[in-house]
A protein has these predicted regions:
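Hydrophobic small-molecule pocket/channel-lining residues, especially in calycin-type beta-barrels
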Residues: 1-170
């Protein structure tokens, strides 16, 4: 399979550190994260590839994110709001996944932050740039307490899933 040609979001994606805004600084600042933690996050993302493996089928959206600072797997039913208890404490995160088809997904989340509550919209969609397929991520965060918003646009290049799994083992 040629991993550079995609018609849907399914498969492995590696953050393109040379296109868009790969840094999460503005997002993290809006969330109220400390400067020290932001610098550590940026260092981690510079040293280790950020990989997303996406699977959309049977009305479900599954994503496995791996990076120096984030290793998680989530699965949601498309069109159904999901509440998740966060530890420690009894705070909740609410997530709603919507999709207009296999080449686009929008994950809307309301979650607690360092200084209150945030609304996040994470839109992933296929785009064609210079005859190459990329996954464009438009990540919008709004801090409900400060009313501050920030939009980050990141691009991912397609990789074979086996490549993504090899990266995790190294």
């Amino acid at each position: 399979m040629n991993s550079n040609v995609r018609e849907n979001l399914n498969g492995g994606w590696k953050l393109d550190k040379n296109r868009g805004e790969p840094s999460m600084r503005g997002y993290l600042e809006t969330m109220g994260v400390s400067e020290l933690a932001i610098v550590a996050h940026e260092k981690g993302e510079a040293e280790v590839d950020t990989i997303n493996v996406i699977q959309m089928r049977d009305g479900k959206y599954k994503i496995k994110k791996t990076s120096r600072v984030n290793n998680m797997e989530e699965e949601f039913e498309i069109g159904k709001e999901t509440k998740t208890k966060l530890t420690p404490g009894d705070k909740e995160k609410m997530t709603l996944v919507q999709s207009e088809g296999p080449a686009q997904v929008c994950v809307k989340t309301i979650m607690p932050t360092m200084n209150g509550l945030a609304e996040v919209s994470d839109i992933k969609e296929l785009v064609n740039i210079d005859n190459s397929t990329f996954m464009k991520q438009s990540l919008t965060i709004t801090n409900k307490d400060t009313n501050r918003s920030y939009v980050t646009e990141r691009f991912y290049i397609p990789i074979d899933v086996i490549d993504a799994e090899d990266k995790e083992d190294s």
